[in-house]
Regions:
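A preference for well-ordered globular domain cores
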Residues: 2-177
Protein backbone atom coordinates (compact mmCIF):
# COMPACT_ATOMS: atom_id res chain seq x y z
CA UNK A 1 0.00 0.00 0.00
CA UNK A 2 2.75 2.47 0.89
CA UNK A 3 4.47 1.79 -2.42
CA UNK A 4 1.26 2.91 -4.17
CA UNK A 5 0.61 5.97 -2.02
CA UNK A 6 4.09 7.52 -1.88
CA UNK A 7 4.38 8.19 -5.65
CA UNK A 8 0.93 9.79 -5.59
CA UNK A 9 1.95 12.06 -2.73
CA UNK A 10 4.84 13.39 -4.78
CA UNK A 11 2.27 14.74 -7.24
CA UNK A 12 0.70 16.87 -4.49
CA UNK A 13 -2.18 14.57 -3.76
CA UNK A 14 -4.15 15.69 -0.73
CA UNK A 15 -6.91 13.09 -0.59
CA UNK A 16 -6.93 9.64 -2.12
CA UNK A 17 -9.21 8.97 -5.07
CA UNK A 18 -12.81 8.79 -4.02
CA UNK A 19 -16.20 8.16 -5.57
CA UNK A 20 -18.47 11.20 -5.37
CA UNK A 21 -22.10 11.99 -6.14
CA UNK A 22 -22.85 15.20 -8.00
CA UNK A 23 -24.41 16.36 -11.26
CA UNK A 24 -23.77 15.33 -14.85
CA UNK A 25 -22.45 18.77 -15.80
CA UNK A 26 -19.56 18.61 -13.36
CA UNK A 27 -16.28 20.12 -14.53
CA UNK A 28 -13.55 17.54 -15.02
CA UNK A 29 -10.87 19.97 -13.86
CA UNK A 30 -11.85 22.62 -11.34
CA UNK A 31 -10.13 25.01 -8.97
CA UNK A 32 -12.15 24.60 -5.79
CA UNK A 33 -10.14 27.06 -3.67
CA UNK A 34 -8.13 29.72 -5.51
CA UNK A 35 -6.60 31.06 -2.29
CA UNK A 36 -5.14 27.67 -1.32
CA UNK A 37 -4.68 26.64 -4.98
CA UNK A 38 -6.72 23.43 -4.49
CA UNK A 39 -7.85 21.64 -7.63
CA UNK A 40 -9.99 18.59 -8.33
CA UNK A 41 -9.67 16.18 -11.22
CA UNK A 42 -12.78 14.13 -12.06
CA UNK A 43 -13.39 11.21 -14.39
CA UNK A 44 -15.63 8.20 -14.98
CA UNK A 45 -18.78 10.34 -14.84
CA UNK A 46 -21.73 7.95 -14.75
CA UNK A 47 -25.16 9.57 -15.24
CA UNK A 48 -27.85 8.69 -12.73
CA UNK A 49 -31.43 9.81 -12.31
CA UNK A 50 -32.70 13.42 -12.53
CA UNK A 51 -29.40 14.93 -13.70
CA UNK A 52 -27.35 13.31 -10.95
CA UNK A 53 -24.11 11.45 -11.54
CA UNK A 54 -21.39 9.54 -9.76
CA UNK A 55 -17.76 10.04 -10.63
CA UNK A 56 -14.26 9.57 -9.36
CA UNK A 57 -12.43 12.55 -7.95
CA UNK A 58 -8.95 13.39 -6.75
CA UNK A 59 -7.80 16.60 -5.08
CA UNK A 60 -4.46 18.32 -5.65
CA UNK A 61 -2.75 21.12 -3.73
CA UNK A 62 -1.78 22.76 -7.04
CA UNK A 63 -3.07 22.92 -10.58
CA UNK A 64 -2.25 19.46 -11.91
CA UNK A 65 -0.20 19.18 -15.07
CA UNK A 66 -1.43 17.28 -18.11
CA UNK A 67 0.88 14.42 -17.15
CA UNK A 68 -0.56 14.32 -13.62
CA UNK A 69 -4.13 14.31 -14.94
CA UNK A 70 -3.36 11.55 -17.45
CA UNK A 71 -1.46 9.53 -14.84
CA UNK A 72 -4.27 9.86 -12.29
CA UNK A 73 -6.97 8.67 -14.68
CA UNK A 74 -4.90 5.93 -16.33
CA UNK A 75 -3.69 4.63 -12.94
CA UNK A 76 -7.30 4.36 -11.81
CA UNK A 77 -8.28 2.46 -14.98
CA UNK A 78 -5.33 0.10 -14.46
CA UNK A 79 -6.40 -0.58 -10.86
CA UNK A 80 -10.01 -1.17 -11.88
CA UNK A 81 -8.86 -3.59 -14.58
CA UNK A 82 -6.68 -5.43 -12.06
CA UNK A 83 -9.61 -5.65 -9.62
CA UNK A 84 -11.89 -6.99 -12.35
CA UNK A 85 -9.32 -9.62 -13.30
CA UNK A 86 -8.81 -10.66 -9.67
CA UNK A 87 -12.40 -10.84 -8.53
CA UNK A 88 -14.68 -10.54 -11.55
CA UNK A 89 -14.58 -14.14 -12.78
CA UNK A 90 -17.07 -16.83 -11.86
CA UNK A 91 -17.08 -20.47 -12.91
CA UNK A 92 -20.26 -22.48 -12.53
CA UNK A 93 -21.69 -19.48 -10.61
CA UNK A 94 -18.87 -19.61 -8.06
CA UNK A 95 -16.40 -16.72 -7.67
CA UNK A 96 -12.82 -17.55 -8.65
CA UNK A 97 -9.95 -15.43 -7.31
CA UNK A 98 -7.49 -14.95 -10.19
CA UNK A 99 -4.41 -13.76 -8.33
CA UNK A 100 -1.09 -14.12 -10.13
CA UNK A 101 -0.32 -17.12 -7.94
CA UNK A 102 -3.63 -18.80 -8.75
CA UNK A 103 -3.21 -18.06 -12.47
CA UNK A 104 0.21 -19.71 -12.33
CA UNK A 105 -1.18 -22.74 -10.49
CA UNK A 106 -4.08 -23.12 -12.95
CA UNK A 107 -1.71 -22.86 -15.91
CA UNK A 108 0.76 -25.34 -14.42
CA UNK A 109 -1.98 -27.87 -13.71
CA UNK A 110 -3.49 -27.38 -17.15
CA UNK A 111 -0.15 -27.62 -19.00
CA UNK A 112 0.85 -30.74 -17.09
CA UNK A 113 -2.52 -32.36 -17.74
CA UNK A 114 -2.23 -31.59 -21.47
CA UNK A 115 1.36 -32.86 -21.65
CA UNK A 116 0.44 -36.12 -19.91
CA UNK A 117 -2.88 -36.61 -21.73
CA UNK A 118 -4.70 -36.25 -18.42
CA UNK A 119 -2.55 -38.65 -16.37
CA UNK A 120 -2.09 -35.98 -13.65
CA UNK A 121 -5.84 -35.68 -13.14
CA UNK A 122 -7.86 -35.35 -11.05
CA UNK A 123 -6.83 -31.97 -9.69
CA UNK A 124 -8.75 -29.95 -7.09
CA UNK A 125 -8.94 -26.16 -6.92
CA UNK A 126 -10.42 -24.04 -4.16
CA UNK A 127 -12.94 -21.51 -5.50
CA UNK A 128 -15.48 -19.36 -3.69
CA UNK A 129 -14.53 -17.19 -0.75
CA UNK A 130 -12.70 -17.72 2.52
CA UNK A 131 -16.03 -17.90 4.33
CA UNK A 132 -17.73 -20.02 1.66
CA UNK A 133 -15.09 -22.17 -0.04
CA UNK A 134 -16.02 -24.47 -2.90
CA UNK A 135 -13.63 -27.28 -3.77
CA UNK A 136 -13.93 -28.18 -7.44
CA UNK A 137 -12.41 -31.39 -8.76
CA UNK A 138 -11.42 -31.60 -12.42
CA UNK A 139 -11.27 -35.26 -13.41
CA UNK A 140 -11.08 -34.96 -17.19
CA UNK A 141 -8.93 -32.93 -19.53
CA UNK A 142 -12.08 -31.65 -21.24
CA UNK A 143 -13.41 -30.36 -17.91
CA UNK A 144 -10.12 -28.67 -16.98
CA UNK A 145 -9.79 -27.19 -20.48
CA UNK A 146 -13.25 -25.65 -20.16
CA UNK A 147 -12.32 -23.96 -16.88
CA UNK A 148 -8.87 -22.80 -17.98
CA UNK A 149 -10.11 -21.47 -21.33
CA UNK A 150 -12.90 -19.49 -19.64
CA UNK A 151 -10.52 -18.06 -17.03
CA UNK A 152 -8.06 -16.95 -19.72
CA UNK A 153 -10.89 -15.52 -21.82
CA UNK A 154 -12.05 -13.50 -18.80
CA UNK A 155 -8.55 -12.07 -18.39
CA UNK A 156 -8.22 -11.23 -22.10
CA UNK A 157 -11.69 -9.63 -22.27
CA UNK A 158 -11.04 -7.61 -19.11
CA UNK A 159 -7.70 -6.37 -20.44
CA UNK A 160 -9.31 -5.42 -23.77
CA UNK A 161 -12.05 -3.48 -21.95
CA UNK A 162 -9.43 -1.67 -19.88
CA UNK A 163 -7.42 -0.78 -22.98
CA UNK A 164 -10.56 0.63 -24.65
CA UNK A 165 -11.29 2.83 -21.64
CA UNK A 166 -7.74 4.16 -21.60
CA UNK A 167 -7.74 4.67 -25.39
CA UNK A 168 -10.78 6.98 -25.25
CA UNK A 169 -9.27 9.19 -22.53
CA UNK A 170 -9.40 12.74 -23.91
CA UNK A 171 -7.12 15.22 -22.20
CA UNK A 172 -8.75 18.11 -24.10
CA UNK A 173 -11.84 17.69 -21.88
CA UNK A 174 -9.69 18.94 -18.98
CA UNK A 175 -9.02 22.37 -20.49
CA UNK A 176 -9.89 25.30 -18.23
CA UNK A 177 -11.19 28.52 -19.77
Amino acid sequence: LYAEIIPLLTYGLIDLMKKVEGNTGVRLLECINPIKNKWRVRWDVQPGENGSATYMEEEFDHRPTEDEIRSTVITWHNRETDKDILSGFTYENVPVWLSSENQFNYKAAYDLAVQTAGATLPVVFKFGTDTEPVYREFATLEDLTDFYTKAMQHIQNTLADGWKKKDVFDLSLYAVD
